[in-house]
Regions:
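Nucleic acid-machinery interaction/catalytic patches
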Residues: 1-440
């Protein structure tokens, strides 16, 4: 019999994996523990919804790893942000309509730039037109994902006493958001964000009215888009459904948790908005956790608690001394070690003068990690998490010099790929066919 059954409690079923734990690894371990001694095909009817295709591939690999050679028929793993109406979790004919195809991102960018030059800014340089197209596209994507339908009031949002360029920008947006849908309609296409939000809304409505009877697990999503949040709520309430949240802080002070709705910069804000009105934080259960070394568990919990306290909203930091004293008094369930010292163990602060020095330092640290095996002889892995794409690419370039190929999630610039360099040289040659520098 399986030791862990996520569908045993009455719905809605909300679970969470601690921030310090490897999310997809624990998710796969929990799914396989639930599978227990059932036949391998028992998993094939299940639908696993993950945030994106990258997570879907990583989860499939984690399942194979934890299966340990056991034969499995894999579940239907689908990216929540890239659903298609003719694929699971949609049943054939469930929607009763065919949505127009989405315009390709590159085509959209150039069509927007052409529209801006032809209809609004004649004589605008191509580079500036593309920049305005990017800004317009990002604005429309945000509105469509948030399902904001009334965009006609944009021009009235800027007060008369503000700068002229603010008013001009608002007027341009007001005209562009009316002209662009007409241009798309003439092409028989729709925006990708609108199509994605529409599919999620249709799925949420269908599963709310007719809950799925098959096994459905939605994991890793924070439901930042309203339609996605409603899909998660429908999955949690389904007879064989559950939602697994990433990194929910279940130990944060209730008084602080209650204030997160007004603090959009806090890391837990998205989870607060998802759970608000749908489930109480106290009702979220811990997901399956594999066996863990007690020392590593205590160190990990100490670090997680310390970081969570460091991220308290500014309005709730007046009692930090009390919090630190409470952490030490609690000593994390009887552990004798100082939890503050435990939480800081292994953390380093490096101060550098320039970005190149930062890239060199990070690359060296990652190389050292990869070349230092675990006590049992197995290899280590490491990851660099940074919002600075340029820094990530600098680190990847330095690692490449040592024969280490980093998997950069942001992708590679076209100019750094062989095909991109070929196109660049061809364009330069066409522009200046007799230029010796272009030929060389």
């Amino acid at each position: 019999m399986a030791r862990f059954d996520p569908f045993l409690p009455a719905g809605p079923r909300w679970y969470a994996v601690e921030a310090r734990r490897p999310f997809l690894e624990d998710l796969a371990a929990g799914v396989l523990d639930w599978l227990g001694d059932h036949p391998p095909e028992a998993l094939s009817d299940a639908v696993i919804l993950l945030p994106n295709r990258r997570a879907a591939r990583a989860f499939t690999a984690a399942l194979s790893k934890h299966a340990g050679g056991r034969p499995l028929l894999l579940p239907q793993v689908r990216p929540l942000g890239d659903l298609e109406e003719d694929e699971p979790p949609f049943a054939p004919g469930e929607l009763g309509l065919d949505l127009p195809p989405a315009i390709a991102p590159l085509t959209r960018r150039f069509e927007m730039a052409r529209m801006i030059v032809e209809d609004f800014r004649p004589g605008l340089s191509p580079l500036r037109a593309l920049e305005m197209a990017d800004a317009l596209g990002g604005f429309l994507d945000s509105c469509q994902l948030e399902e904001i339908g009334d965009l006609h009031r944009i021009a009235t949002l800027v007060e008369g006493d503000l700068a002229e360029h603010w008013r001009e920008s608002a007027e341009f947006l007001a005209l562009a958001v009316e002209a662009w849908p007409k241009r798309l309609e003439a092409m028989g296409l729709v925006d990708p964000a609108w199509r994605r939000a529409r599919l999620l809304r249709l799925l949420a409505t269908a599963w709310t009215e007719r809950p799925p009877t098959q096994t459905v697990i939605a994991a890793g999503s924070t439901g930042t888009a309203p339609a996605a949040a409603d899909v998660l709520a429908a999955v949690a309430a389904a007879p064989r459904g559950c939602v697994v949240l990433p990194g929910l802080d279940r130990e944060l002070d209730p008084a602080v948790w209650a204030t997160l709705g007004d603090n959009e910069q806090h890391p837990q804000n998205a989870l607060w908005r998802l759970l608000h009105g749908r489930a109480e934080r106290e009702a979220v259960r811990p997901w399956f956790r594999p066996a863990e070394d007690p020392v590593e568990q205590a160190r990990g919990r100490a670090r997680q608690r310390l970081i969570n306290e460091a991220l308290r909203p500014a309005d709730a930091t007046d009692d930090w001394r009390t919090v630190i004293s409470a952490l030490r008094a609690d000593a994390f369930r009887g552990q004798s070690a100082d939890p503050i010292a435990q939480g800081l163990e292994g953390l380093s602060v490096v101060t550098v003068r320039a970005e190149e020095d930062a890239a060199a330092t990070l690359a060296l640290m990652m190389r050292e990690t990869l070349e230092t095996p675990n006590p049992d002889g197995t290899g280590k892995t490491c990851a660099l998490v940074t919002p600075d794409i340029a820094l990530g690419r600098r680190v990847a370039a330095r690692l490449e010099r040592w024969g280490v190929v980093a998997d950069v999630s942001s992708g590679q610039p076209l100019s750094r790929m062989a095909a991109g360099r070929l196109v660049d040289l061809a364009v330069r040659f066409v522009d200046k066919p007799l230029d010796p520098h272009a030929l060389l």
